[in-house]
Regions:
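Short helix-boundary/re-entrant hairpin motifs in multi-pass inner-membrane proteins
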Residues: 19, 75-144, 168-169, 235, ...
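Predominantly late transmembrane helices and immediately cytosolic-facing juxtamembrane segments
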Residues: 92, 204-208, 274-307
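Membrane-interfacial loop-to-helix junctions in multi-pass transporters
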Residues: 68-76, 106, 137-148, 229-239, ...
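Membrane-interface alpha-helices at helix entry/exit sites of multi-pass transporters
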Residues: 19-22, 105-114, 221-238, 273-280
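Alpha-helical multi-pass transmembrane bundles of energy-transducing inner-membrane proteins
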Residues: 1-73, 156-222
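Cytoplasmic/organellar membrane-interface segments at the starts of transmembrane helices
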Residues: 40, 47-57, 233-235, 288-356
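Alpha-helical transmembrane segments
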Residues: 94, 160-163, 214-229, 291-310
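Helix-coil boundary and interhelical linker segments in multi-pass alpha-helical membrane proteins
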Residues: 124-138, 178-198, 265-273
Length: 356
């Protein structure tokens, strides 16, 4: 895949080739599971319609959604799809490729991998609608995956001393929060999950870009090199804190309505799941605020910081549109919620009354 070469050839770490190989092997494992699941779905459609193979194989999503799937096969398809997308999301325990790539890969590639939640989208768009009975029966498995990912990644993030690795674990933890919202099977939870997918695509990507700006200036994103950044880089610090506060769900930013809806949806279904979501949000605030205080505030602890310079105009311009969006979505979330309301209703109806 292209990312193998992008990470292996243009990564910033000494272990970039190993990181590229690790990423590729993980993606291959997930891809094989997805291929098997899709092949089973297509073969089942051919069997149901008495069509010849391979001529009768159909990979059209609307067709597959309308094709009956026996319970045993549906459970197998569900598990294969869940595993494949859990690797790509990633969910614990399939997450180890992301922190490695975050430390070794080029910033622009890591920003894409951290920001885009294609694995979560796959679970929402394909795994549960294609196997609705199994998804409803085993929603507790998805809830467990989400809660463990949310809490475990947050606890690991609390111990990090490097900004890039911290952001990688924060991304994994937020994936867990989104999965908790999806698994709640409530309107609030699903709407919050969709909102959070869009929300964290903006926030995580920009935070990783900011870490790239810091690395370009100082040659490191470890906290031992970062103390007192606010004194030398006030513009970078202001932008960083805006997106950092959005990532922990401060009111007035897009993170607040998304996290609030997920927590409400989880509490509606199961108090333990809701408490897990709430604890994940609290831990998220803990690791982000703690690291930010050490890295940006306080005295300057490294001589390279004094010789550095603040964000340039073109760098600020790159961040301007996402900053406006997270503030707009924070103060006026109704637009996003109205847009995904109908889709959320249709998705939930598919799970509560599976067809055919």
């Amino acid at each position: 895949p292209p990312f193998f070469f992008l990470i292996g050839l243009w990564g910033i770490g000494s272990q970039r080739r190993e990181a590229a190989m690790k990423y590729t092997l993980f993606m291959l494992a997930g891809g094989v599971a997805l291929l098997l699941a899709i092949t089973l779905l297509a073969a089942n459609h051919a069997f149901q319609t008495d069509s010849d193979i391979p001529q009768g194989l159909s990979f059209s999503l609307p067709v597959l959604l309308q094709t009956a799937l026996p319970d045993n096969e549906q459970k197998l398809v569900f598990l294969l799809l869940l595993f494949g997308f859990a690797v790509k999301a990633p969910l614990v325990p399939f997450h180890t490729w992301l922190p490695t790539v975050a430390m070794e890969g080029p910033t622009h590639i890591v920003a894409i991998l951290v920001g885009l939640k294609l694995g979560v989208y796959g679970i929402l768009r394909f795994t549960m609608p294609l196997a609705p009975t199994a998804a409803a029966e085993y929603s507790w498995v998805i809830s467990l995956f989400g809660a463990v990912t949310l809490i475990y990644a947050a606890l690991i993030a609390l111990q990090q001393t490097n900004l890039r690795r911290l952001l990688a674990y924060a991304s994994v933890s937020h994936v867990g929060l989104v999965i908790v919202g999806i698994a709640s099977l409530t309107m609030q939870g699903v709407q919050g999950a969709i909102f959070q997918i869009l929300n964290f695509t903006l926030i995580a990507s920009v935070l990783m870009l900011i870490s790239g700006f810091v690395h370009h200036r100082l040659g490191s994103t470890d906290e031992i090199h970062l103390g007192g950044l606010a004194k030398i880089m006030p513009r970078l610090t202001c932008v960083y804190f805006l997106f950092m506060l959005a990532s922990i769900g401060i009111p007035g930013t897009s993170g607040f309505p998304a996290e609030f809806l997920i927590i409400v949806g989880a509490l509606t279904v199961n108090s333990a799941l809701g408490i897990a979501a709430l604890m994940g949000a609290i831990l998220g605030a803990g690791y982000m605020l703690s690291f930010s205080r050490r890295a940006f505030l306080g005295p300057i602890t490294h001589p390279d910081v004094k010789q550095s310079h603040d964000l340039q105009l073109r760098e600020l311009a790159l961040i301007c549109i996402p900053a406006v969006l997270i503030l707009t979505f924070g103060f006026f979330p109704d637009g996003i919620l109205k847009m995904n309301h109908v889709a959320s209703e249709m998705w939930l109806s598919r799970l509560t009354t599976p067809s055919p």
